[in-house]
Amino acid sequence: MSQLTAEELDSQKCASEGLTSVLTSITMKFNFLFITTVILLSYCFTWLAIRALWKNNIFSNSTRLILIACLLNSVVHQTTMLESRMRQTYRSFVFASEPCNLLYRSSDCVFELHSYYLTGYFSTYSVCSLAFDRLVSHYKSKFYHTHQYFIAVSLLVLQLLLTLVSFYIAYYGVHLAGYVPVCIHYPRLAVHYSTVNTVRTVVMVCCLVVTGFIYYLSVKSEKQIQKSSYSPGKRYTAYENVTTSQSVCILIVLKLFCNMLSSIGINLLLLMGEVVSEGTFVLVALFLPGVTYANLCLPLVIYFKTKLIIRNRKFRIAVMTSMYGDAGEHIDRLKKSWE
């Protein structure tokens, strides 16, 4: 799609025949039902995940605070997506035969633009907070455990700053000219939109590498502690570092996959330019809301990982008590086996 001036975009009030066909199609209505289902599921599991973090927390307090902030942010993002899609679907029924009333003027979508993209960027950069949280936990363990809330708040502030900088680069000063099929559609004159998407993907890859390395070190450290230390506190801390790092790795992998699905897909469509019609671009783009999918994956991982770890803990305790009696006797047996 070629770059047009603001005046040319403002003159295109009516949807083209192809775009009208797409916006009123059965495929678009199926897309609405599919995305709505994803969002409603994310609401349910977000509630379950917050309850798990509050009542059966398996993470450090720092990690838990970051995850709760991400879950609350996801609710705002999903609600913005749902509201925009409901309005678009309503218009597709009411104005199906009036192409000049199908589209939204970009300047009328300021609230959705800010809400959708700010929460989307905040969700993406949560991987930075989680990665640095694991980094500090491993290399500055004593400081980490005595200043967890300070670390979490500091990382969330950094996450917010990255969000604001990305939004500033992508949209500050961009003229909200022309008309868009959905209010969450990026402004047509936002020339740095794809660049910011690429940077977000690179940042996520770097954070995945860092977290994967920390996970490897945590596993290695736990094995050494299990062999050399009899302190329940040290063993427990090492085990918690491994499980937390593993969970964060899973979260980042899923977020990266969802983000790449969206950013790479959109960037490819932008690069193809005139080869892709406006209707096809809109249809494909609405099937690729990566952050929306990631906002479902986040509570799913938290909830089911919590259930799994609690079950494993109960199983280990049952095995230890049934095989060796009390803890003191078990430690004596371990000492003899390690001599």
UniProtKB/Swiss-Prot annotation:
Where the protein is mainly located, per its record? membrane
Topology class, membrane: Multi-pass membrane protein
Entry's Gene Ontology molecular function annotations: G protein-coupled receptor activity
Where in or outside the cell it occurs: the entry states: Membrane
Question: InterPro entries this protein is in?
Answer: 7TM_GPCR_serpentine_rcpt_Sra
- Per UniProt, which keywords does this protein have? Membrane, Transmembrane, Transmembrane helix
Q: Write down a Pfam family by its short name.
A: 7TM_GPCR_Sra
- GO CC, one annotated term: membrane
**What organism is listed for this UniProt entry?**
Caenorhabditis elegans
Which GO BP terms, alphabetically? Answer: sensory perception of chemical stimulus
Please state the gene responsible for encoding this protein.
Answer: sra-21
Similarity comment text for this entry: Belongs to the nematode receptor-like protein sra family.
TM spans (from-to): 30-50, 150-170, 199-219, 250-270, 282-302
Specify the protein name.
Serpentine receptor class alpha-21
